[in-house]
């Protein structure tokens, strides 16, 4: 019974990974749109996009860490 609950909890925690993938896609699609509108700001916008990517990926890594904790620690 407990093992099944752990698997369900870990599966629910990994749903955040799909959200992070959508978020990263939004970051880079916005970068492409912004550079297409104003190519002279491409270098500055790329820095902002990398920052957004890193923050979004950090959330995904935290969710993955929680899934592993649910599976192997509790």
UniProtKB/Swiss-Prot annotation:
UniProt GO molecular function: ATP binding; lipid binding; proton transmembrane transporter activity
Gene3D superfamilies: F1F0 ATP synthase subunit C
Membrane topology note: Multi-pass membrane protein
Keywords, sorted A to Z: ATP-binding, CF(0), Hydrogen ion transport, Ion transport, Lipid-binding, Membrane, Mitochondrion, Nucleotide-binding, Transmembrane, Transmembrane helix, Transport
InterPro entries for this protein: ATP_synth_F0_csu (IPR000454), ATP_synth_F0_csu_DDCD_BS (IPR020537), ATP_synth_F0_csu_sf (IPR038662), ATPase_proteolipid_c-like_dom (IPR002379), F/V-ATP_Csub_sf (IPR035921)
Cellular component annotations (GO), alphabetically ordered: mitochondrial membrane; proton-transporting ATP synthase complex; proton-transporting two-sector ATPase complex, proton-transporting domain
Entries under PROSITE patterns matching the protein: ATPASE_C
One Pfam match: ATP-synt_C
GO biological process: proton motive force-driven ATP synthesis
Transmembrane parts of this sequence: 8-28, 45-72
Cell compartment(s), UniProt: Mitochondrion membrane
Site (Reversibly protonated during proton transport): 57
SUPFAM superfamilies: F1F0 ATP synthase subunit C
Keyword check for Transmembrane helix: yes
Family per record: Belongs to the ATPase C chain family.
Task performed by this protein: This protein is one of the chains of the nonenzymatic membrane component (F0) of mitochondrial ATPase.
Subunit: F-type ATPases have 2 components, CF(1) - the catalytic core - and CF(0) - the membrane proton channel. CF(1) has five subunits: alpha(3), beta(3), gamma(1), delta(1), epsilon(1). CF(0) has three main subunits: a, b and c.
PANTHER family listed in its UniProt record: ATP SYNTHASE LIPID-BINDING PROTEIN, MITOCHONDRIAL, ATPASE PROTEIN 9
Name of the protein: ATP synthase subunit 9, mitochondrial
Gene: ATP9
């Amino acid at each position: 019974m407990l093992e099944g609950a752990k698997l369900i909890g870990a599966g629910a925690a990994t749903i955040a990974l799909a959200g992070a993938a959508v978020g990263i896609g939004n970051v880079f699609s916005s970068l492409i749109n912004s550079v297409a509108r104003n190519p002279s700001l491409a270098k500055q916008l790329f820095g902002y996009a990398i920052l957004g990517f890193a923050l979004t990926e950090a959330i995904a890594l935290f969710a993955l860490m929680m899934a592993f904790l649910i599976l192997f620690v509790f």
